């Protein structure tokens, strides 16, 4: 955790506590926490719903919402002719700064190809808000 994070200070204790709990289940660091794993996207009425749940991290698998998984889901949704629009379903306190600009740029580019929006499904702060704002909806 030697990276700069953009999230509310009070969330730092929660993130650290969850990481500490992984000490008793180190395999979770490799496989990821099942309840937080990205599921790609779900197509609902022609809308690709991409979940962004938990702290935003660089790579999916060990914790939170991986920027790589969100970017991959975004790319797949753009290529899917059944997806007329893209919705980021966000419940996140924010996360790492590194890589967020690149993902934000990808979201901004996506909105030039398909209608994009973000839904703050609870907390949407810091780096998560940055990503949401790139949809402009």
List the predicted regions and their residue ranges:
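N-terminal organellar transit peptides
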Residues: 1-137
């Amino acid at each position: 955790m030697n990276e700069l994070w953009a999230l509310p200070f009070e969330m730092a204790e929660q993130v650290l506590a969850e990481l500490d709990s992984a000490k008793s289940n180190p395999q979770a660091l490799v496989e990821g926490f099942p309840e937080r794993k990205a599921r790609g996207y779900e197509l609902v009425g022609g809308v690709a719903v991409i979940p962004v749940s938990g702290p935003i991290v660089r790579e999916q698998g060990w914790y939170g919402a991986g920027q790589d998984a969100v970017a991959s889901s975004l790319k797949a949704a753009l290529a899917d002719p059944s997806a007329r629009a893209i919705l980021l379903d966000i419940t996140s306190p924010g996360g790492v700064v590194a890589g967020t600009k690149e993902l934000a740029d990808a979201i901004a580019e996506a909105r030039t190809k398909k209608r994009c929006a973000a839904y703050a499904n609870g907390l949407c702060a810091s780096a998560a808000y940055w990503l949401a704002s790139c949809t402009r909806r």
